[in-house]
Amino acid sequence: MGVDVKRFLVVMLLLRICEYAAASTFPLALRNCSDHCGNVSVPYPFGIGKGCYKNKWFEIVCKSSSDQQPILLLPRIRRAVTSFNLGDPFSISVYNKFYIQSPLKHSGCPNRDGYSSSSLNLKGSPFFISENNKFTAVGCNNKAFMNVTGLQIVGCETTCGNEIRSYKGANTSCVGYKCCQMTIPPLLQLQVFDATVEKLEPNKQGCQVAFLTQFTLSGSLFTPPELMEYSEYTTIELEWRLDLSYMTSKRVLCKGNTFFEDSYQCSCHNGYEGNPYIPGGCQDIDECRDPHLNKCGKRKCVNVLGSYRCEKTWPAILSGTLSSGLLLLIFGMWLLCKANRKRKVAKQKRKFFQRNGGLLLQQQTSFLHGSVNRTKVFSSNDLENATDRFNASRILGQGGQGTVYKGMLEDGMIVAVKKSKALKEENLEEFINEIILLSQINHRNVVKILGCCLETEVPILVYEFIPNRNLFDHLHNPSEDFPMSWEVRLCIACEVADALSYLHSAVSIPIYHRDVKSTNILLDEKHRAKVSDFGISRSVAIDDTHLTTIVQGTIGYVDPEYLQSNHFTGKSDVYSFGVLLIELLTGEKPVSLLRRQEVRMLGAYFLEAMRNDRLHEILDARIKEECDREEVLAVAKLARRCLSLNSEHRPTMRDVFIELDRMQSKRKGTQSQAQNGEEHAHIQIAMPESMSLSYSSPNIVVENSSFSLDTKPLMPHKTQ
């Protein structure tokens, strides 16, 4: 058993010695002084022999022993030295540590009764106990304390109970099972140490051991606690301090000690190695002698005092020049390609602008001399930024004419951006005329067009944004936030009639919408109706009575007479409005496969109910109870007149508006504005004098679709 203990101590000493036994070329001791005692290097301020140490506290006595390995003694503290910390020459490490033997404190150990003292007193010396040491207790039933001048500053307990033994790592580390370790509180710089051991349970016998050591007893350094009662010594790490303020130089770095005045701990600066306590003891490290000491790689290493530098060789310089030139060439080509791509994009935008009638728009707006609102022309970049590059998440709706996106302009204004699908070149002139005409319309119930963009392949229109969905959604997908009462429906019908009447008769050039339906009636934040989507709307010369165009519109709303004759008149919009009135009355969709084939169209379904006096049966259940029956009957009769197969028997939009306005005014207890003769102001839409409108008369073309008759519109064109 004693042999095993000796082997353990030898292993610990060899580990400490090997850590700092690397061969060094710098002087450790003063000139003509021995720097070794056996295999242990002895650095200054320690020394062997008179005149070789700083003062008496650092005197080393090299004493021969029977096992042929000399013992290093510090006579002033009566302790044996095991090794010195020579520091790391390649980092600023403080060069002020050494290691001594210290006896263990035993209690209740029959084999070690003669070794019961573990006290250490360093008062008056330049030495103090390093905070790297750990207070250690070994044995069963042990309660140990570290004492400093009568005060217990650290303690721990050990037991052999099964509850701790089952803990993972209990047999290979000091966690309380037969062994425990505690760190010393930092910054104390203790010079006095003693240990006290007690029994946890007085009635139980056992051997208790306590000591101070710089080793952490775990892993490969773990010693079974049973062996520690046979141990005599362990090693303690000590540090020293000296008044060396005069030593600081470019090669030596000394830092003051917080607790001891005029006390310093020194080290060599980075790039130097040696003993900082010897004048001239820090010498330059030649980093170029070993590739591992520098980072020059293939470059030439040149040693300088305290450091090194890397110089490029001619091949390296040539390689670097070629690499830099290649990078500059690549960067230049990238800039050239970027500029060329930018030039192509700008050229393409100019091409689209001219092809889409941009020059014509500029020419026509110049004729107006600022007498009317000019059409704002947006750049493609403006609208890309406004719509986040036409992100799919910004889509408000899609239809036969194109896709509508929600956007925000630079000034914070929210707009609706309509990206059309296609436009024929022969219709561009008429398209520009329509933009100018529609941009001058200013009516509270008409969605205002704010401008356009002609730099894209297909022109883009910008409208005011209407936030509160369309009438179709409110009728067929109702929400509790906005109930569609009869009063609201009558108000919406009156507002839509007002807008269409304005377009038909209150402007100098009548405009036919040609696609009146509930999805094209938007509701703003105040639930005011706004007529939108003029994608297929057309203006007509004041002396003309109709347009002759390709048949377009939405099934369920299209005038049957228009389908047969290709002639679109203001009465065709009246027919579509009549279907809209029925939609408001019944809450039914304009086309439904759930109805019989002959009444799938809402108009036919309504007329059949009127003939059979079943109007009350088809009314929307949401308005049956609260509506005024006389008002409902009056609106139903007005809708029947609007659906007359002979357009001459239909009322004009002006007549429809007067009738609805009278009903609404009567409901509010006021006199109708229309009855009082307060007509719409006749708005003069300015057009260039050189422009007149005429229309071609193509054959009927109807799309093969069960729900839509959307086709490309025939635009009015300039006469020669």
Swiss-Prot record:
TM stretches of this protein: 316-336
Classification via InterPro entries: EGF_Ca-bd_CS, Kinase-like_dom_sf, Prot_kinase_dom, Ser-Thr/Tyr_kinase_cat_dom, Ser/Thr_kinase_AS, WAK, WAK-like, WAK_GUB
Family annotation (CDD domains): EGF_CA (cd00054), STKc_IRAK (cd14066)
Membrane topology, Cytoplasmic segments: 337-720
Enzyme class name: transferase
Region (Atypical EGF-like): 252-310
Residues the record lists as binding ATP: 396-404, 418
Glycosylation sites: 32, 39, 147, 171
Sites bearing Phosphothreonine, chain numbering: 549, 554
Gene3D superfamilies linked: Laminin, Phosphorylase Kinase, domain 1, Transferase(Phosphotransferase) domain 1
Primary location: membrane
Domain notes: The EGF-like region is specific to this family of proteins and seems to consist of the C-terminal of an EGF-like domain fused to the N-terminal of another one.
Protein name: Wall-associated receptor kinase-like 8
The organism of origin for this protein: Arabidopsis thaliana (Mouse-ear cress)
Taxonomic lineage: Eukaryota, Viridiplantae, Streptophyta, Embryophyta, Tracheophyta
